[in-house]
């Protein structure tokens, strides 16, 4: 695709961030070469950082007029993107969403715009490659890259370019974003899937690109991983309650984990109550052993433990949201 075709469009790149002082400047330097070819501006939408991120962002904005600083008093990412589009999106064709803690290829933004123009898609989503550094983080990365951890999700594993219902948000036509009302700010998690549902219902098309992808770094410790997936589960339940959109099969199976785990407490009455959770645990650990032996992956057993944490947390979050909803209605 010619450079003239790229510069015939304009893009607003939005980076929601909170306490990213160690990453934000390097990320801006990574994106800076793409700004002129794409006729783009980049917005750092800060949710009240206390680690120096705000000062760095303001300095970067004074050094380059294409870099903009925006306060995000609501703190969550969905609110950051909504405010950036509302206040700064006029005149831009595309919204490109960047995660402050991710890693991107040098030509990431160019490939997104190229695929949007080539396919006519209203949204272009990408696959995520999960990478870790510490022992537990590496194990979590292997879990999230495996079917045990992602259920075969194509935006986790990557696939040939195709039309999709959902994926990791990367690019969206601002006209389409505004037409469906942007992100629902009541969602602290799963706001991307909820927006994709509304896009699909409104007739907009989502393209999963195979021209580029991003690298994501998972939680490095067990407790933060649990609460992250607990939030994901709550978000998926909120989506169900709002749209009556049933979870897919790959999500339905983990839904049973929290009930059978709590049901195991009944083993003091009848030992059979522990059988379901035992079968689940054995299946997960067996998969981990297969990873260790069949794939020669030394992190296999620990990856299985990480996946079990993800299953349990996601299921617990889903059911907690349903129970809270019933209490609110009552």
Swiss-Prot record:
It is a multi-pass membrane protein. GO terms for biological process: polysaccharide biosynthetic process. One of its GO terms (molecular function) is glycosyltransferase activity. Its EC number is 2.4.-.-. The keyword Mitochondrion does not apply. Pathway: Glycan metabolism; exopolysaccharide biosynthesis. The chain crosses the membrane at residues 116-136, 260-280, 299-319. It is found in: Cell membrane. Disulfide bonds: none annotated. Its main location: membrane. One of its GO terms (cellular component) is plasma membrane. Keywords: Cell membrane, Exopolysaccharide synthesis, Glycosyltransferase, Membrane, Plasmid, Transferase, Transmembrane, Transmembrane helix. Belongs to the glycosyltransferase 2 family. Glycosyltransferase required for the synthesis of succinoglycan (EPS I). Needed for the addition of the second sugar (glucose). Catalyzes the formation of a beta-1,3 linkage with the galactose lipid carrier. PANTHER family: GLYCOSYLTRANSFERASE, GLYCOSYLTRANSFERASE 2-LIKE DOMAIN-CONTAINING PROTEIN. This is Succinoglycan biosynthesis protein ExoA.
């Amino acid at each position: 695709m010619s450079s003239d075709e790229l510069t015939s469009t304009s893009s607003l790149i939005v980076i929601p961030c909170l306490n990213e002082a160690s990453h934000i400047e390097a990320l801006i330097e990574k994106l800076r070469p793409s700004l002129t070819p794409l006729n783009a501006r980049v917005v750092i939408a800060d949710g009240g950082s206390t680690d120096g991120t705000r000062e760095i962002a303001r300095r970067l904005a004074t050094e380059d007029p294409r870099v903009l600083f925006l306060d995000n008093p609501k703190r969550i990412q969905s609110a950051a993107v909504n405010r950036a589009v509302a206040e700064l999106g006029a005149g831009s064709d595309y919204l490109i969403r960047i995660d402050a803690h991710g890693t991107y290829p040098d030509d990431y933004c160019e490939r997104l715009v190229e695929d949007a123009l080539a396919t006519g898609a209203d949204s272009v989503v990408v696959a995520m490659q999960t990478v870790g550094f510490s022992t537990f983080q590496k194990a979590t990365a292997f879990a999230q890259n495996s079917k045990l951890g992602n259920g075969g999700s194509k935006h986790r594993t990557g696939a040939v370019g195709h039309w999709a219902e959902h994926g990791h948000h990367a690019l969206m036509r601002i006209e389409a974003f505004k037409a469906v009302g942007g992100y629902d700010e009541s969602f602290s998690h799963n706001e991307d899937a909820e927006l994709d549902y509304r896009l699909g219902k409104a007739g907009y098309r989502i393209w999963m690109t195979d021209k580029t992808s991003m690298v994501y770094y998972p939680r490095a410790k067990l407790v933060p991983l649990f609460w992250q997936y607990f939030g994901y589960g709550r978000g998926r339940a909120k989506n169900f309650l709002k749209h009556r959109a049933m979870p897919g099969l790959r999500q339905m199976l983990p839904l049973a984990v929290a009930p059978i785990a709590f049901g195991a407490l009944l083993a003091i009455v009848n030992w059979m109550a522990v059988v379901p959770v035992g079968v689940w645990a054995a299946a997960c650990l067996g998969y981990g052993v297969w990873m260790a032996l069949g794939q020669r992956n030394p992190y296999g057993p620990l990856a299985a433990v990480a996946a079990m944490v993800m299953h349990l947390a996601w299921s617990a979050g889903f059911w907690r949201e349903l129970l809270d909803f019933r209490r609110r209605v009552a």
